[in-house]
Amino acid sequence: MKEIKDFERIKIKIASPDQIRNWSYGEVKKSETINYRTLRPEKDGLFCERIFGTTKEWECYCGKFKSVRYKGIICDRCNVEVTHFKVRRERMGHIELAAPVAHIWYYKYIPSRIGLLLDITASSLNSILYYEKYVVIEPGDTDLKKMQLLNEDEYIEARERYGMSFNASMGAEAIKTLLENLDLDELSSKLRIQMIDKDDKTDKKLLRRLEIIENFKISGNKPEWMIMEVLPVIPPEIRPMVQLDGGRFATSDLNDLYRRVINRNNRLRKLLLLNAPEIIVRNEKRMLQESVDSLFDNSHKRKVVKGSSSRPLKSLSDALKGKQGRFRQNLLGKRVDYSGRSVIVVGPELKLHQCGLPAKMALELFKPFVIRRLIESEAVFNIKRAKNLIEQEVDEVWQILDLVIKEHPILLNRAPTLHRLGIQAFEPVLVEGKAIKLHPLVCHAYNADFDGDQMAVHVPLTPAAQAESWALMLSTNNLLNPANGHPIVFPSQDIVLGLYYLTMEKKNVVGEGKKFLNFNNVILAINNRSLDYNASIYVKIHGEYKKTTAGRVIFNEALPKGIEFVNKTLSDLELQILISKVYVVHGSSIVIEMLDIIKELGFRYATKFGCTISMSDIIVPDEKRTYVERANKEIAKIQNDYAKGVITGEERYNNVVSVWLKTNEELTNKMMEILKKDRDGFNVIYMMADSGARGSRNQIRQLAGMRGLMAKTSGDIIELPIISNFKEGLSVIEFFISTNGARKGLADTALKTADAGYLTRRLVDIAQDVVVRIEDCGTINGIKVETVKNGEEILESLKEKAVGSYSIERIKNPITGEIVLDANEEISEAKIELLEKIGIEKLVIRSVLTCEAEHGVCQKCYGRDFSKNKPVNIGEAVGIIAAQSIGQPGTQLTMRTFHIGGVAQAGSEDDKISLKNAFILNGIEGFNVRVDNGILFTRKGTLKIINVFYEEKIKNIKEIKVLDSQRVIKGIPLFIDKKGSEILSSYIGYVKLRDDNFFIVSEEQEVSLKAGTKLEIEVGDYVESGKVIGTFDPFAEPIIAEVKGKIKFKDIILGTTLKEEINTETGNVEKRITDNVFESLDPRIFIIDSSGMEVASYVLPGDAYLQVEDGQSINIGDIIAKLSKGSEKTQDITGGLPRVNDLFETRIPKNLTEMAKVSGIVQFKSIQKGKRLINILDEYGVEHKHYIPAGKHLLVRDGDVVKAGDMLCDGRINPHDVLEILGGISLQEFLLAEIQDVYRKQGVSINDKHIGVIIKQMMKKVKIVAVGDTNFVYGQKVDKHTFYEQNRKVIEQGGEPAIASPILIGVTKTSLNIDSFISAASFQETTKVLTDASIAGKIDDLRGLKENVVIGHLIPTGTGMGLYKKIKVSENIDSEV
């Protein structure tokens, strides 16, 4: 017999009535279950032994045959076959239905599948099936139409009128006849013609009908099979009946549901034999339909069937659905034996690969192994005696347990397991007590602490499982974080503090300035107390004296040999950098040795130095009062401006918040400065924060500075700050304000955890079948990577972006012409350094986004596996790693939606512009006007600048060795100075000779400016670093006059488009344009010159505050109106988790911007239906219409030239628009940048390739826009590879290929549309997925991980891949010659 598990694909179809009868071992005729006296199954009942098999092993029902030797004999008295009782798990029965019944999945679920085939609505279908209306099947030669519905009266009338010349009927029989009469081929071609004729080709109903018809044709299912004549009865062991204490029975709900069906079926059969009146028969048929519906899906009905305890009964569908359903409860997650759990405590004495296991627990877990050893050692001779010995806990048992445990790994898991490092293997060490001991350095990977956390222990039993634990899961093999390649095993808290203390330098202590020949002398001096740990000394290293401290010598002495001398104060970051460096240079074995040394040293010296905190360590700066007084003065001035009406209420609020944030920042800086100087840097609070052991600048600020501004529950900032700190104590009002944020914090955390968990689940589902399957897909496409900058600050270097990837193109040294990097070569750290040295700033690399492997990805496109720092192996489940890498930090992301000017940005809003580097202004772009003392930008603008890296006066140069504008790299001779020495370049850039200066400058860069910015420099100016070059209003966006003249209002009508508000606080009148949209009114301001001509026009958006009067004279640069930033309250910046969710689900943002579809000239048209029409005239003179909601702030004006993809009004970008206008590559870049932005702001580092894997899955499908000669349907969404494959076949046969456009689908939808129906069904909407899959006769190729777990195969990754399955091991012994 072929091994049952040895199959490669699985198919799902609709079972035909014959198929169901084939499966069956007999018909269930009675609704009885078991006899209440004998407790044996009733004959022909739901548990009948004749049908389902015997309940007693190798014995028939009546007891005539009792032995295994009669196997297979059918008893002549009771007709029961002599078999094993386990057949009751697999033998099915059936019920012959007295009337056909429709299957609820195919008629009730929306869209109704039967309804689509017959083209009738769901309600009409229901009325036919529930015997309310007749349907005309054959109209004959009458006036009736086929499929026409008739109620009782109409039917009687038609019969009287036409007699028997037409055929009409009701119930499932009628539907069955209609389905049998369908000609699918004819219907398909008819619908295809209809689709071509219809101009609106994307008629969804037509598309759905065509898809269903094609699916029926391909799968070989017959439509009439959706109507059932025979009902299968599942095996009795799957719907068991068990006796409880007290003689009562507990039974599966399915038995009750089956009994209702059998009772009604039998009753109907009797009524049909008796020729009962039609109305009674019809009612019984309807009840039969209802009972079968309840059996298949009880929860989907309006009136659910309830059991004795008035709870809804669980039907077959309910058993599959949801978290408690078969898929998620029993198939994807199972409870495991040989496991235990206990509280964890710290085990500082353990080695990195060890964990402490309580002896009692170990004895229980390893019991079978101990029993086997006891019997082998002949201490006992049977299992029962061995168990007794174990219970008595005699000495031999402990000795044997020690032997058993040696080199038998165990797995430790801490819930929640957010990434693969949540389960690791350790070698157990027996410990007393009942708590598991955990190594302190692995806490970070588990996110564990010792405040009562519990962990589970699992014992891998088979040799293969043990080998896998040793080779792959041992804690020492998991030193790096798979998300980014940074070490995940590193010291924190006490250890960091101990090492920080040890390696710090202190002035004026014992032994300062002494010289030592070697390390041993230093340690002797310390032991003799003639040298302080923190004393600055000189030690001979590699033949020369080096200045260091005694503590650093101790640290370096303890490190493994070969690691270069570490001569700095070690904070947590420094330690992580050190671990990283040692890993790269010396490999993991040295790192493991070093980590245990670091742990040991850290704990020892933290104990030795024993730092404590007292109130006197918390130093409140004396300047605090001055700062607060100054802030109050500034606020008084702001209030005064507000009272005069110079600024609006929102500007006032924003300014006040800004003042307090600045004050708080200044005070914090001062406080940290004071703490740093206190006790020469040995202030304990400062040390804890500076070393990164515990606490942060923010927390110290609350202790010794001021608590600062608090946020309300809504996320708004309360403008009244808490000026006190915890040392001074809070006043009553301050305490009350500070309670505001606390509750929100707790609620957020609870919601966030569930949200992040769900995000991970969706990501795992979409990416679970992405496995590295081949070595090289042979693509020639790649993506461009360059350094990510914010202004001048480098956020992510080229190294972080490209290291570990493969290059697409060959790169040569621009000067020597030699090949630095070949095509398809891995970009190592050394290569990147070389590239940076020769000035390469952009690279095209292979990426998962452009991989062309048919399934999964290829090795070359994926690049490096970060958890091992080596190229990825074939068989690595990179999809799941990607999902975990993105989901795991999800719990750290905030939930709060920030307001503009709220905590999110207020810190950075400054009203002055200055740049860090010196630069030369090359040019200006954007609309600007000249005013008295500078240039005023009336709209957004750009400065074209070149940064100056190096400058020298030409008079100090003897001979210049380079040309003007020449590109130079590091190490190139630039000039010979007056002293005759050759000066080499230490920068990459361009030479610029100007006036009497020699500069090295960068490539031209752009700096964006806001509207209303006043620039105080001119083109061509050389500007020193840090100099203020311009000012702007951070809290309002002005609309500025670009010409001189008189103001003329158009459609600005008081009470309609203009609202005058009298400010109750100040008594000033504020004029505001309303948000209301009127068809005919378009509020604008014209500027008229002296001759009465209109020279400029300005559209006024909703919520703009007017600053001018009608008829008033105006000069260039005057403000006409301003938009307060506060009025952008509605546009909350969705931060953190909700933003990531929106991006992965590709939701259309609320406050949407309109992007220019083409490049061209803007033309303003009228307002239609509340939307402003803007045309863009492209280079061919074609107009492209854009509709923008009136009242939105426009970013373009009439006559402007725009590029495709430019924003026409403010708002958020819709990712679908990016795909449509700018294409797939731009969309990938957009999504990648947006998602990374959220994580980067939270300080989380995730490599691009992980996000790339998910985006690749989201863009897997294409939409058919032209069918050609293929079998596709217009508007159908198909997999890219299916599309290419079909086209290839059509082209080979000389046909016309189909055309498709790329589409973007959110993660939930993608998971449901995945090729594997098992995976999709186990994700969400189980019944819907199975319904569609059965109609299409889908085949699951079992490629992904989930589907293999469900059916009980090994997952197809690593050694479970088909690649390795077929390997045969054979011994090849050479015979001696």
Swiss-Prot record:
Entry keywords, A to Z: DNA-directed RNA polymerase, Magnesium, Metal-binding, Nucleotidyltransferase, Transcription, Transferase, Zinc
InterPro entries associated with the record: DNA-dir_RpoC_beta_prime, DNA-dir_RpoC_beta_prime_bact, RNA_pol_asu, RNA_pol_N, RNA_pol_Rpb1_1, RNA_pol_Rpb1_3, RNA_pol_Rpb1_3_sf, RNA_pol_Rpb1_4
Signal sequence annotation: none
Residues annotated to bind Zn(2+) 2: C777, C851, C858, C861
Cofactor: Mg(2+); Zn(2+)
Keyword Iron: no
Record carries keyword Cytoplasm: no
Catalytic activity: RNA(n) + a ribonucleoside 5'-triphosphate = RNA(n+1) + diphosphate
SMART domains, A to Z: RPOLA_N
Cofactor binding note: Binds 1 Mg(2+) ion per subunit.
Residues annotated as binding Zn(2+) 1: C60, C62, C75, C78
Chain residues that bind Mg(2+): D449, D451, D453
Enzyme class: transferase
Gene3D superfamilies: 1.10.132.30, 1.10.150.390, 1.10.1790.20, 1.10.40.90, 2.40.40.20, 2.40.50.100, RNA polymerase II, clamp domain, RNA polymerase Rpb1, domain 3
Record's GO cellular component terms: DNA-directed RNA polymerase complex
Family according to the record: Belongs to the RNA polymerase beta' chain family.
Described purpose of this protein according to its UniProt entry: DNA-dependent RNA polymerase catalyzes the transcription of DNA into RNA using the four ribonucleoside triphosphates as substrates.
Name of the protein in question: DNA-directed RNA polymerase subunit beta'
Naturally occurring in which organism (per UniProt): Borreliella burgdorferi (strain ATCC 35210 / DSM 4680 / CIP 102532 / B31)
